[in-house]
Regions:
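Bacterial N-terminal signal peptides that target proteins for export
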Residues: 1-10
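N-terminal acidic, proline/glycine-rich, low-complexity intrinsically disordered segments
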Residues: 2-3, 24-26
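Hydrophobic helical h-region of N-terminal Sec-dependent signal peptides
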Residues: 9-17
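C-terminal motif of bacterial Sec signal peptides marking the signal peptidase cleavage site
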Residues: 19-21
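Electron-transfer interface patches adjacent to heme c in soluble/periplasmic c-type cytochromes
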Residues: 25-27, 34-55, 60-277, 281-298, ...
């Protein structure tokens, strides 16, 4: 059975990217209870075998989504004929240097689409899976979670290096890639092209509205109850939503709150969710680079944080949503257009993990820096912080 409404992708979780709303209100009861999922209670410790399988799923599993990317969007044809490595790197695709033969980059033509086909054949393009026949034609092309939620360390050259799973690919221009499809109408292509690098709208193919989100990190999730900006469900809920409705995977997903009920036989998604979650839970938030934080200033900032921010950014997870709290957009001072499209109609306080790494901030990327975030909440929450206190608070946030 095919999914007729899927036209895009993204990945998993959609967790947050910065300081989220501070306030004390909760949404009505009917919007606070996440839909039940197949997700079992989290284990205290996942086995090495399960985490290893989860890594495989995260990096290489398409869930059968070739039915979208190949059969419907025909992007296999576009990549084979028109996408050379230089173009691929410009739209944010990454290359895993660990699978490249020594010296290969010095020997190949980075302006030839045939080189892209060769890289796909070596399984070197992060987040893409391709079947290449004996005549070097791409017969099947699909995407994986890693497309949006992995990057590389640029150790070979920009866009080519060692994998960094869980790091959001803020260079990836998802919309521009989708817009390469020869089957899309011009007005649809214009919407996709408007999103820009590092953003994606995981509901556009459901409601026809466009309010793209910043691609979130997939690390630091182990103590976080709900993984989306609007807290509609736990990690396996969102993984299933994206795998089925966005990536085009052949699996089951149902949420009556959103009017979605998709089933496939066989279901290629549900059985893989526990291992995928185990791998995501194993990915720690990256510490700030050595020497990048002034410890004395950060300690002053911690005192300010404890006084002004910790009522919402509570505990090790940094979110009061673990206790069920959501915040109406009016309390946050951020745009409510995206929340209005969701089941909860509200925003979750975002966990503060690895903030130094993933600017811009807020769900829509409207704050370019942590200083902008602090200034925003100083104004909205009337905190009365001096410029020096704001700088101290920023330094503390960089340390998380």
């Amino acid at each position: 059975m095919a999914i007729e409404r899927t036209r895009m992708m993204a990945f998993i979780i959609a967790a947050g990217t910065a300081l989220s709303a501070c306030g004390t209100t909760k949404p009505p009861a009917e919007s606070t209870s996440p839909v039940a999922t197949t997700e079992p209670p989290a284990k205290q410790e996942s086995s090495t075998t399960e985490i290893t399988e989860g890594q495989r799923v995260f990096r290489f599993e398409t869930f059968g989504d070739e039915q979208l990317w190949t059969d419907k969007l025909r992007l296999n044809e576009v990549v084979e004929k028109n996408v050379d490595p230089t173009t691929a790197l410009k739209v944010g695709l990454k290359v895993d240097a660990d699978v490249l033969p020594a010296g290969v980059l010095e020997k190949v033509d980075l302006k030839s689409p045939a080189t892209t086909v060769a890289l796909l054949k070596m399984n070197a393009v992060v987040g893409l899976q391709a079947t290449v026949d004996a005549d070097n034609h791409i017969t099947r092309l699909g995407v994986t979670c890693a497309l949006c939620h992995s990057t590389v360390d640029d150790s070979v050259m920009p866009g080519i290096g060692h994998r960094k799973d869980g790091w959001p690919n803020r260079n990836l221009n998802v919309g521009a890639i989708i817009a390469l499809s020869p089957v899309l109408a011009a007005d649809k292509k214009a919407v996709y092209q408007s999103w820009g690098p590092g953003k994606y709208d995981p509901r556009y193919n459901q409601d026809g509205k466009s309010t793209p989100l910043v691609l979130p990190p997939a690390y630091g999730l182990a103590q976080v109850k709900n993984e989306t900006y609007t807290a509609e469900g736990p990690i396996s809920y969102w993984n299933a939503y994206v795998a089925v409705t966005q990536m085009g995977g052949q699996g089951d997903f149902s949420d009556p709150r959103l009017g979605i009920d998709v089933k496939h036989s066989p279901d290629m998604v549900t059985s893989r969710l526990p291992a995928l979650r185990a791998y995501q839970h194993s990915l720690p938030a990256p510490p700030p680079p050595a020497g990048s934080v002034d410890a004395a200033v950060a300690e002053r900032g911690r005192t300010i944080f404890d006084r002004t921010c910790a009522s919402c950014h509570v505990g090790g997870s940094g979110t009061d949503n673990n206790g069920g709290t959501l915040h109406p957009p009016a309390d946050t001072g951020v745009d409510g257009a995206y929340a209005a499209r969701t089941a909860s109609k509200a925003y979750r306080t975002t966990p503060l993990r690895g903030l130094w790494q993933h600017a811009p901030y807020f769900h829509d990327g409207s704050a370019a820096t942590l200083a902008d975030v602090v200034a925003h909440y100083d104004r909205v929450r009337k905190l009365g912080l001096t410029p020096e206190q704001q700088r101290d608070l920023v330094e503390y946030l960089k340390s998380l």
